[in-house]
């Protein structure tokens, strides 16, 4: 039987994912658990207890990996060099929390793995050998990979699927090509009331999105939750190669969309990897970011979003509340002030929007695109957390501050 420590830890992780909706779920999970591991070991050292006490005791099948960090770098050597630093957390709020399937459906309680304090199944076998344990994914080899279940969807199916997965946090950050690939790899499954969709303790094979109907979650034959249209379940077992933590049964007739394990992992990993590649040159060539380590750049790349503006579009307006920091990938912008007119012009690899975030002030100027301009944006919450030492450089260059 799995310990209370393990149950509460999983529940805390579920809630954390809900609250943060991380762009890179795999990296977030790795950072979250490695940080918890580091905290646990510090406490253990203070208590003169050697080592980390695994929730699986001497039967922990992951003990070897735990000694080297709970999760290894999914991206191999990658464009940023070595392994990811297990001591960093890519999302700041890890106060305990878990997985949430967004959309019309349920909250975090409605994922089968989001079981709160429900008991772990009796047949949750930590020593079970799963066939996916040797699944090594190399994102830089994805160009040669062809999904097994790819099938072009009809217009009617596409509309249904866009509605079903459009707000699901696992997919809403995918680029258009990756999202199209996901949609065309989904398999429609219609199940009758009473059908057992997944069984606790079994090996994870599919991730499911509920289009219509309601499903129930059971642990040790005890009902713990229900979930409806727009929700999803089955993700954790695929991500971490762990047995199913619950049995899921159709409470009504249901229409489900299923994504197989390999496609699920490759699309999500591949998307994050390509995003890092895309932003690598931009971040390395920006003088203000020279102080960032390769790992810090990787975390920053994962958090960036892309926006494109056409000539004449106002990107930020003087007096507005500042919510984002901007890095120009390509293009040109005019910076103007109401009383001063044109102040300066910006070009490739310049940045703007930092003053409002550094000083918690309204926007100090208006920035307008003068031709087609592509920018990478970083939200306010990630500004201090991810820019690290680069924030000090930004402060030194802050035009609103007096320097000696």
UniProtKB/Swiss-Prot annotation:
The keyword Nucleotide-binding applies. 3',5'-cyclic AMP 2 binds at residues 288-404. Residues 99-109 have a biased composition (Polar residues). 3',5'-cyclic AMP 1 binds at residues 170-285. Residues 43-125 are annotated as: Disordered. One of its GO terms (molecular function) is identical protein binding. GO terms for biological process: adenylate cyclase-activating G protein-coupled receptor signaling pathway; cellular response to glucose starvation; cellular response to nitrogen starvation; negative regulation of Ras protein signal transduction; positive regulation of protein export from nucleus; positive regulation of transcription by RNA polymerase II; protein localization to bud neck; regulation of cytoplasmic mRNA processing body assembly. The modification Phosphoserine is found at residue 131. Transmembrane segments: none annotated. GO terms for cellular component: cAMP-dependent protein kinase complex; chromatin; cytosol; nucleus; plasma membrane. SUPFAM superfamilies: cAMP-binding domain-like. Residues 27-169 are annotated as: Dimerization and phosphorylation. InterPro entries: cAMP-dep_PK_reg_su-like, cAMP_dep_PK_reg_su, cAMP_dep_PK_reg_su_I/II_a/b, cNMP-bd_CS, cNMP-bd_dom, cNMP-bd_dom_sf, RmlC-like_jellyroll. Keywords: cAMP, cAMP-binding, Nucleotide-binding, Phosphoprotein, Repeat. The keyword Magnesium does not apply. Residues 88-98 have a biased composition (Low complexity). PROSITE patterns: CNMP_BINDING_1, CNMP_BINDING_2, CNMP_BINDING_3. Tetramer, composed of 2 regulatory (R) and 2 catalytic (C) subunits. In the presence of cAMP it dissociates into 2 active monomeric C subunits and an R dimer. Belongs to the cAMP-dependent kinase regulatory chain family. This is cAMP-dependent protein kinase regulatory subunit. The gene is PKAR.
């Amino acid at each position: 039987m799995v310990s209370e420590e393990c149950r509460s830890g999983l529940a805390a992780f579920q809630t954390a994912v809900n609250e943060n909706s991380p762009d890179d779920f795999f990296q977030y999970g790795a950072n979250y658990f490695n940080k918890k591991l580091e905290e646990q070991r510090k406490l253990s050292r203070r208590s003169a207890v050697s080592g980390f006490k695994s929730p699986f005791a001497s039967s922990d099948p992951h003990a070897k990996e735990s000694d080297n960090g709970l999760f290894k770098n999914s991206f191999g050597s990658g464009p940023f060099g070595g392994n990811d630093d297990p001591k960093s957390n890519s999302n700041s709020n890890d106060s305990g929390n878990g997985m949430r399937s967004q959309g019309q459906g349920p909250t975090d309680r409605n994922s089968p793995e989001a079981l709160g304090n429900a008991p772990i199944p009796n047949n949750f076998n930590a020593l079970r050998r799963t066939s996916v344990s040797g699944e090594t994914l190399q994102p830089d080899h994805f160009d040669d990979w062809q999904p097994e279940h790819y099938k072009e969807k009809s217009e009617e199916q596409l509309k249904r699927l866009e509605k079903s997965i459009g707000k699901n946090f696992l997919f809403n950050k995918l680029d258009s090509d990756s999202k199209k690939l996901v949609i065309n790899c989904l398999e429609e499954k219609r199940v009758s009331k009473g059908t057992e969709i997944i069984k606790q303790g079994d090996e994870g094979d599919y991730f499911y999105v509920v289009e219509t109907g309601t499903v129930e979650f059971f642990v040790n034959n005890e009902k713990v939750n229900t979930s409806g249209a727009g929700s999803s379940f089955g993700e954790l077992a695929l991500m971490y190669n762990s047995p199913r933590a619950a049995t899921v049964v159709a409470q009504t007739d249901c229409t489900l969309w299923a994504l197989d394990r390999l496609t699920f992992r490759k699309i999500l990993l591949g998307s994050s990897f390509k995003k890092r590649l895309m932003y690598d040159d931009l971040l390395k060539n920006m003088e203000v970011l020279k102080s960032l380590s390769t790992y810090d750049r990787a975390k920053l790349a994962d958090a960036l979003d892309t926006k494109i503006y056409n000539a004449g579009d106002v990107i930020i307006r003087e007096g507005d509340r500042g919510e984002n920091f901007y890095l120009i990938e390509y293009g040109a912008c005019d910076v103007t002030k109401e009383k001063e007119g044109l102040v300066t012009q910006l070009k490739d690899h310049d940045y703007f929007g930092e003053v409002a975030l550094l000083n918690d002030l309204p926007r100090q100027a208006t920035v307008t695109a003068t031709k087609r301009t592509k920018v990478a944006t970083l939200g306010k919450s990630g500004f201090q957390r991810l820019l690290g030492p680069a924030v000090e450089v930004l402060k030194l260059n802050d035009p609103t501050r007096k320097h000696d």
